[in-house]
Amino acid sequence: MTKSHSEEVIVPEFNSSAKELPRPLAEKCPSIIKKFISAYDAKPDFVARSPGRVNLIGEHIDYCDFSVLPLAIDFDMLCAVKVLNEKNPSITLINADPKFAQRKFDLPLDGSYVTIDPSVSDWSNYFKCGLHVAHSFLKKLAPERFASAPLAGLQVFCEGDVPTGSGLSSSAAFICAVALAVVKANMGPGYHMSKQNLMRITVVAEHYVGVNNGGMDQAASVCGEEDHALYVEFKPQLKATPFKFPQLKNHEISFVIANTLVVSNKFETAPTNYNLRVVEVTTAANVLAATYGVVLLSGKEGSSTNKGNLRDFMNVYYARYHNISTPWNGDIESGIERLTKMLVLVEESLANKKQGFSVDDVAQSLNCSREEFTRDYLTTSPVRFQVLKLYQRAKHVYSESLRVLKAVKLMTTASFTADEDFFKQFGALMNESQASCDKLYECSCPEIDKICSIALSNGSYGSRLTGAGWGGCTVHLVPGGPNGNIEKVKEALANEFYKVKYPKITDAELENAIIVSKPALGSCLYEL
C-alpha cells in the first residue's frame, strides 16, 4: 500500500524558478497573476490552489464510516494573495467572476474571530469559513503570536473553474485554498503546511455556514495526486491514501463528468430521500445486531447514527463470532472477506421482507414498542415513508463498500494484457455501483439513467451517478488520448441528451455541463 498522507507529507510548494510546474499551475498562474496586478496595481506574493473532486465509487456509504474512492479533478479554485503590513489590518476580496461583488472587512485587533452570518448568502462567507479554521489552527500553532493579536491584512484575488452547484465540491476547493493561503500569509515562507493538518482543519469549515459533511471533499481536494485515485478512510481517523492508476499502452485514463442539470433541493426532499436513507441504514444495523445477539457501540452523538451503523455491526459481529476483537482497520483483503460475509447475513436475516419493514415489524425485531422505536429513530430529522427498505439499503451499503475495495485491489494487483482489460474491469465496478444506487438505494433519476445509457453506447466503459444523486452529476470512465472516445461521448451527450431536454441551452452552459478530467494534483502553493 502506498503511504497515506500523514503529518510529514507537506502541501507541495513551487516557485517561478521551478523547471517544470504541475499542469494546473503552469496553465493558470500567469493569468491570475496578471489579473491581480490589474486589480490591485501590485504583484501578489503567492498563489494558493485547491481542486474540485469527483467520487469514482463509494456512494452513500461515508455516513456508515466505510471508505470511498474519489479523485481530484483538473478544475480548481485559486487565490492570489498579497500580505499587507497594516496597523488596522483588513482583507479585500475580488473575484474574477463579476457576479461575485468585491468585499472588504476589518480584522479584529484583539485577535478574535471574524463573524460569519450563515443567514446571509454571500460568497465571502465561504472565504470566512476558510479564514476561521486557519485562524483557529494558528492560535494553537503559535499562541504567543495569534492569541490576542490580529492576523495579517490581505489583498486577495479569487478565480475558479469548478462548476458551482454541480456536486464537484467547488465550496470545499475554495475553502481549502483559502485556509492554505491564510496560514501561509501569517506564518511566512519558513512554515510548510502538512496535508494532514490542512485536511483536518478544513473538514469542519462548512459547518459555520450550516453545512455538515463527512470529510471526503476536503480529503480529495487536499491530497489529490496526478494519475492517482484516493482511498479515503473515515475510521479510526480521516486518512487519504493515493493509489496509482495502471500505465496503459495506448490510452489515457480519463473521466467525462456530465451534469444532469437537475437540482435536488436537499431541504425539501430530505424527508423521503437523504434523511430517510440515514434512518434506514441505522435501523438495518440495529435489526442485524438484534438478530445476531450483539450490542452496537454508540456512534456519533447528536445524530441518528448515535445508534451505531453498519460498520459498527460488522465489527461487533466479528468480535462475537470470529473472536476478532480489533475493529476492521481498512485493510483491503480482510475488508473484502468481512463485507462478503455481511452480504450473506443480509440475505439470511433481511431478505424475507424485501417488500419493506413496517414500524411494527421493526419494533418487534428490536424487542421494543412502536413508541420507543419512533422516539429513538424517527424524531432526529423529519422523515416520511410507508415502509423501511432495510434489506435493499443494507445490501447497497455492504456491496458498494466491497466494490471500493475491489477497485483498489484491481488498481494495485491486477495486470492487464490490453488497455481494454482495465477499462472493462474497472468500468464493470462503476456500472454495478450505478445499478445498486438505482435499484437498491433508489437515489438515481431518469436523467441520470439516460445520460449513463447514452455514454455507455458511445464509448464509456463505466457510467454512474456521483454525489448524493437524485440529480446532480454523473461520471464516466472513457479512454482518452488520440485513440480515445472522449469526443464521441461528449458529442452524443450534447445531441441526444442536452439539446433534447434543454433545447435552449447555450454553448457556454453546455461547456460547463460536460467536462473532462484526468486525476489531478491536490492543494499546492506557487510563490512568486
Swiss-Prot record:
Belongs to the GHMP kinase family. GalK subfamily. GO terms for biological process: carbohydrate phosphorylation; galactose catabolic process via UDP-galactose, Leloir pathway; galactose metabolic process; positive regulation of transcription by galactose; positive regulation of transcription from RNA polymerase II promoter by galactose. ATP binds at G165, G167, S169, S170, S264, N265, K266. The active site is at D217 (proton acceptor). It comes from the Eukaryota. Galactokinase is a key enzyme in the galactose metabolism where it catalyzes the conversion of alpha-D-galactose to galactose 1-phosphate. Can also induce the transcription of the yeast GAL genes in response to the organism being challenged with galactose as the sole source of carbon. It's striking amino acid sequence similarity to GAL3 might explain its GAL3-like induction activity. The modification Phosphoserine is found at S381. GO terms for cellular component: cytoplasm; cytosol; nucleus; transcription regulator complex. NCBIfam families: gal_kin. One of its GO terms (molecular function) is ATP binding. Optimum pH is 8.0-9.0. Keywords: ATP-binding, Carbohydrate metabolism, Galactose metabolism, Kinase, Nucleotide-binding, Phosphoprotein, Transferase. Transmembrane segments: none annotated. Pathway: Carbohydrate metabolism; galactose metabolism. It catalyses: alpha-D-galactose + ATP = alpha-D-galactose 1-phosphate + ADP + H(+). The record marks R53 as: Transition state stabilizer. This is Galactokinase. Alpha-D-galactose binds at R53, E59, H60, D62, N213, D217, Y274. SUPFAM superfamilies: GHMP Kinase, C-terminal domain, Ribosomal protein S5 domain 2-like. Coiled coil: none annotated. Its EC number is 2.7.1.6. The gene is GAL1. Induction: Expression is regulated by the GAL4 transcription factor.
